[in-house]
Amino acid sequence: MTQIKLLLLSLAITAQSITYDLPSQWDHQWLTQQPLGSDTTCTTSHLTAFQMSKTKDPIFFSTGGTDPFLSPKMLPLNSTAGEQWEFDGVSPDAKMAFVFGFYRDPNYAILGSGNLRVSVEMLWPNGTRFAQVDYPTDSVIEECEWGTRGVWRADEFSYSFEVSRDLQTARVAMHTPQVTGVVYLDSESKPRYPDGKIYPSETSTSEALPYFHFVEPIPVAKSQVDLMILGESYVWSDGVGGMERLWGAFSWFTCLQGMNVVRLHAGPYALSLLSFTSNIKKGNEYPSIALFENGEPVFSSQRTEDSDTADYFTFTKTYDGKVTGTLRDKVTGYELELVSPGEKKHWTFIIDHESLAFEYILGGGHGGSGFAGFVQGGRVGLEQFRGIALTEALTFPKKSPLFRSQYSETS
């Protein structure tokens, strides 16, 4: 544990080339405190790679309300439920991007590596991509008065994230044979539920669609990156990024047919969109969007049908741009329309892909493609702004040799 503390301290020192204001407690408490789990004012969740429930008794499963966004959403793990802490970002020139996933998820245990996983994907300016997946021996989530820290580790590597209590600041640190360094996020938004309400809300649920949940601790943020990848510097400032929490009672393959994600920042505007297509309620769409202006919420909706009274939005994939992926869906961008009849306000944002940031192939032309791009938009009739965006388009195949649906009407 002392080695991990020293590692985090050394990573903070190496990142001094980026000027960044961290919560004052972090360096005092987390970088010099006693080992993880020793502070009685903190709550600790420790899970090893093969640790899970040995019975069919019900487990704790979070469904929203005032449950802290960073807390584990299920304890203990069972054979179907899994969760993810996800961070992503894109550089200001839309030529570099990252996506990191911290997993407690038994659905990949069929590979023989246990229930813990960390995935790292980065886009280089020349268009090549770096990816690695590590399988930790254990993970620790420590929730303290000043924030939450997670560590996924094994003897040969460690990954960590730290998020301030107000969910406005985050940093991710990693030390592996191939990648070392730190990523920072500084929120341009407020933590939100699928219904658009701001955390905490006693009346909100995290269920975005049947058996699948999300919340966004950091919907949109400024991103700064200071990494070394295979001995080469990987650095940017003033990018865009964010953090999501995703979890489900069953696997993604069981719950989802598809997903679309947009995260953008343009002028005073920050926007987050997630739209899911259900595999349990076949083909039903479950969209959610939130718009922030100067960090404050100004629009949110789950409605995509026109209305004379209720706020609604539309999002349309475009296919006439210059950059697409290798999968069947050749999307090159998105067009977003947000309408508030009551406020007599209307916003539009048009995104064009600039780079293919990441891609994972699930067979038959299906899978996920993530893009870095540029956005132009703002309130109709007023000044328009140019900015950067990160998007993802995901479709699942109807059948897979690796995964089977875990749901039945008697589940």
UniProtKB/Swiss-Prot annotation:
Tell me the first and last residues of the signal peptide.
1-17
The protein's annotated pathway = Mycotoxin biosynthesis
Enzyme Commission number(s) from the entry: 5.5.1.-
Alphabetically list the UniProt keywords.
Isomerase, Signal
Superkingdom of this entry's organism? Eukaryota
Q: Name one GO molecular function term.
A: isomerase activity
Q: Name one Pfam family in it.
A: DA_C
**InterPro entries in the cross-refs:** DA_C
Family membership: Belongs to the Diels-Alderase family.
| Protein's recorded name | Diels-Alderase ffsF
Organism annotation: Aspergillus flavipes
